[in-house]
Amino acid sequence: MFILGLTGGIGSGKSAVSDYLGKQGITVVDADIIAHRLTSDGSPLLITLKKALGDWVLDHHGRYDRAAVRARVFSDAQTLDQLNAIIHPAIHQAILDELDCSRSAYTILSVPLLFEGRHKSPNLLALCDHVLVVDASNEIQRQRVAKRDGHNPTQIQAIIDQQISREQRLDLAQKIGADILVNDKTLDELHQTLDILHQKYLAMAAQHGLK
């Protein structure tokens, strides 16, 4: 199996990339989607989170309150560590299960914090045979997130600050030989670039299968 790691800052356009390649028949294993599924209403993981952290992790409907949790962990490192200790192993196992089920020519593993977790356990970067980094300027990131999520500038900056800087991400990408896709043009132009990259990854996957 050839695994293509997909990462990038918030608002860079990772979903646009994975959605398009998914339409080409490529399996996409998305860590964010898995995390949402695992914390859905009444899930075992949500029950565990409530017991470990308290009722504040739920909204008044009994659903996982992502906004409240996000606000809390920004200023509370201990709670963040507790949260990660519960969620990350479950997400990692679900990722491994989905990867094992993939039968497409190559498989995309989409992880927003792929580089940030490289020195932690589990290290999802170690699963990847190659990496595609989606890049956009900080200003474009802010504009896209504000339009998509309705966050104010302070909230957006807080999210960006949880990630490594754009400069660090690009430096790491170059060091490991990752592809860097600058996503600052139209959707049609993005798709044209992805058509080229898709053929490249098909060839890389075929070569990988011969080893």
Positions of predicted regions on the chain:
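Walker A (P-loop) phosphate-binding motif
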Residues: M1-I33
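Short, structured coil segments at secondary-structure junctions
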Residues: Q24, L53, A126-C128, Q174-I176
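Well-ordered beta-strand positions
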Residues: T27, I33, H130, G177-D179
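Residue-level signal for inorganic ion chemistry
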Residues: D32, L83, I108, I156, ...
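ATP-dependent small-molecule kinase phosphotransfer cores
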Residues: I33-Y106
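An amphipathic alpha-helix signature
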Residues: L46, K50, N138-A146, P153, ...
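ATP-dependent NMP and nucleoside kinases share a basic, alpha-helical "lid"
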Residues: Q93-D100, L109-R144
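Small-molecule kinase domains that catalyze NTP-dependent phosphoryl transfer to phosphate-bearing small molecules
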Residues: I95, R103, K120-P122, K147-K211
